[in-house]
A protein has these predicted regions:
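Short linear Ser/Thr-Pro motifs
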Residues: 25, 45, 125-126
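ABC ATPase nucleotide-binding domain signature region
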Residues: 33-35, 39-94
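Short loop/turn elements that form and flank the Walker-type P-loop nucleotide-binding site
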Residues: 30, 64-66, 140-141, 171
Length: 172
């Protein structure tokens, strides 16, 4: 389970603090898939970053004993100057992947980037970056995957592949 206790998050503005959450309390079951829906600017991505502990609340806390992915979003998790392959190796190393060559091969196959896998990520389209980040994440075994819009990009076949991958992970 993921427990959110008295979570408060604000950002400074000229009109004073703009609260995203104020004393939010919630328990997320981890045995089910959970969708967080809301309008643009509602705080979904902020919540994901706090769940992943890549951003911290003003007050309150997030409690869990589960391993969690980073928030997989359209533009996150890659270094533009590095190639897709170099980014994959980097992600594998910081997530303690045991066999980097096997991980790299699985990511390359899943991302469907072909020869572009060895080009700098700065040359990729947003869809290609999303494919790479999604492939890196899905080839690491986390208890919980935080997916933020990444399955809405790419061609219809890749979107189907992404949904099937998430379904398989949820059945494990």
């Amino acid at each position: 389970m993921i427990r959110i206790e008295n979570l408060t998050k604000s950002y400074p503005s000229k009109m004073g603090p703009q609260y995203i959450f104020k004393n939010l309390n919630f328990d997320f079951p981890t045995e089910n898939n959970v969708a967080i829906l809301g309008k643009n600017g509602a705080g979904k991505s902020t919540l994901f970053r706090m769940l992943a502990k890549s951003e911290y609340p003003d007050r309150g806390r997030v409690l869990t004993n589960k391993s969690m992915s980073w928030p997989v979003a359209l533009q996150t998790g890659v270094h533009p100057q590095m190639t897709g392959r170099e980014n994959t190796r980097f992600v594998g190393r910081i997530n303690n992947v045991k066999s980097l060559p096997e991980y790299e091969e699985r990511v390359q196959e899943f991302a469907e980037l072909g020869k572009r896998f060895d080009l700098p990520v700065r040359t990729y389209s947003s869809g290609m970056r999303a494919k790479l980040v999604f492939a890196c994440c899905m080839n690491i075994n986390f208890d919980i995957y935080l997916i933020d819009e990444a399955t809405s990009v790419g061609d219809p076949l890749f979107r189907k592949k992404a949904r099937l991958s998430l379904k398989e992970k949820s059945e494990q």
